[in-house]
């Protein structure tokens, strides 16, 4: 019986009672009790996207844990695969640099071959951009002289120091971007290729321009349309235009011009850019070498 009980002890590390025969006497030994430990996952997982994805979390409460497994998926709630192992336990950040897209993350605490359950999920995306794309079409708009850039307007669709010109611009001395008496011109058909359901992060407009007339506060104002020119954003304006060609950039990679955009609104049928020439004189000549647009977005 003693041998059988000893074998059970080796197998399961416990024996409720061992009967020992020592010189014909029997002695009872108290039972042994095993405790269990559940390894805790880290808490508070968060993800911040952009050019890459930064994960942050609160360390596991399991003090003997070695570190963390980092798992990633392109599908919410499933399909996770381990992409990294982070040590020591006190580490609470990890930077991932996948290709553009939206990703889902969970963490596990680990010690040797033991792992915890998954943490809560966090999600973030890596953005990309279209690059600066030129217009391929243009049209004068109502306002001012009603002729916009009347001299070679197509020149503004190429970056070559050959200029479109708006001569003797406007019919009033107002310096407001919204004044009806200011010359306006539309530039469009940028040929954007943005994946459906992408999140639009920001829109930047590049204007290469100079002025060659009188007036003291010349500037270019820009409005954007998402419905073919029916509705427009609030205008943004450049600094004062000088007599030398300068590149002006309006908007940032995180500036959506006051609205939430859908990827479909950048089609050639929908997207329009309107340039409005403004100065405190009607004898100013605006020269525009290049109009280009860059869209920063996060694919689905």
Regions inferred by a protein language model and the residue ranges of each:
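Sec-dependent, cleavable N-terminal signal peptides
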Residues: 1-24
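Hydrophobic beta-strand segments within extracellular beta-sandwich modules
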Residues: 19, 105-106, 273
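Beta-strand-rich extracellular modules
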Residues: 24, 108-112, 276-278
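Pro/Thr/Ser/Gly-rich low-complexity, intrinsically disordered linker/stalk tracts
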Residues: 27-64, 113-130
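Extracellular Ig-like/FN3 beta-sandwich strand-entry sites
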Residues: 65, 100-102, 266-270
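Recognizes extended acidic, P/S/T-rich segments that occur
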Residues: 69-100
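Beta-strand-rich modules
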Residues: 96-116
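Disulfide-rich extracellular domains of secreted proteins
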Residues: 129-300
